[in-house]
Amino acid sequence: MAVFYRRNIDCAALPRHAAAISVPSARRYNPVMSAITLAPHNYAEVIALLEAREWAVCCLCAAWCDVCTEFRSGFDRLALQHPDKVMLWIDIEDRADLVDEFDVENFPTLLIQHGDDMIFYGTVEADEKSLNRLILGRTRDQPTLRSATTTHRLREKLGRLSDGEI
């Protein structure tokens, strides 16, 4: 059973010094890739991808969580099925500076965003087929299925982290 949480989160703290870093154009990135493990060294790459793609799907996990460890390969396969989305693997302990506003109680927890709009946030089963259906269902172009109640400015927050503002 999934538990759903909704919070108003400022997710716009992506490192802004990333603009000064030589980053390959997001168009040059391989459009079919596995999920990206979010880390300070790749904030600029993630910012570029978030600017190039409308959707972000983030799996919030922990390195010590056996369920998360077992699910990682499934999440990577999901990334291959959704090349139009930025698929991020975020360790909530390593990246607490980015996700500290989230109340993650169980793993894995999934966050789906369209731009800055949080479309889905909640604990999910670590089942590839179920998550694929959830992602497809929440990312359709039907506004009634995508009504967001909160925002999370991931790019902006990564920029602030990169600039040392947080």
Residue ranges of predicted features:
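Short, Lys/Arg-enriched N-terminal segments with co-localized hydrophobic residues
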Residues: 17-32
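N-terminal "domain-start" segment that seeds a small globular fold
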Residues: 29-47
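Local sequence-structure signature of Cys/Sec-based thiol-disulfide redox active-site neighborhoods
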Residues: 47-77
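Thiol-based oxidoreductase modules, predominantly thioredoxin-like and allied folds used
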Residues: 60, 83-97
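Structural micro-motif
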Residues: 102-111, 128
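Non-catalytic, surface beta->alpha helical segment in thiol-disulfide oxidoreductase systems
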Residues: 113-148
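Acidic/histidine-enriched, glycine/proline-rich intrinsically disordered or flexible terminal extensions
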Residues: 141-166
